[in-house]
Amino acid sequence: MFYSRVFNRKTGRFLGYLENITPEGAMIISESPLRLDEVYSLGMSLPEDIYPKLALNFEAKSIWCKSDIDPNFYNTGFQLLDLDEEDIAIIEQIIEEYNFRD
C-alpha cells in the first residue's frame, strides 16, 4: 500500500497520508479534521527511481471529511483541480503500481 506523506505546500505543514488517489480525487488520512470547501496546495514526494519528477504538486478542494474506523484519525476527500497531462500519467502509474482501485 502506498501511504505517501502529504503536505500543504503553502505552509509546509504535514497534513496526513495519501490513502487513495484517482485523476479526479484523493483521500487523505490525518490526525485532525481538515476544513471543508477549501482549496489546498498539496504536495507529496515521489520515489525518484520510479517517477519522472521528485514530487507531485497539485491543487485540491476538500469536499468531505469523516471519522476513520480508528477514532484517532479522519479521512478527507479531495477533488483534484487542473492537473496537467504529466501529473495525470503519474497518478495513473501510482494507481497501477499500488493497486488503487475505485
Language-model-derived ranges and their functions:
Residues 24-29:
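Short alpha-helix capping/helix-loop boundary micro-motifs
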Residues 23, 65-71:
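Short, conserved beta-turn/loop elements at beta-strand boundaries and strand-helix junctions
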Residues 11-13, 51-59:
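Short coil-to-beta-strand transition motifs
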Residues 1-23, 96-102:
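N-terminal helix initiation/capping motif
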Residues 69-102:
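C-terminal output/interaction extensions
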Residues 18, 60-62:
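Conserved hydrophobic positions within beta-strands
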Residues 8, 46-48, 64-66, 82:
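Beta-strand elements of well-folded, non-transmembrane domains
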Residues 1-3, 35-47:
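Short coil-to-beta transition motif at edge beta-strands of beta-rich domains
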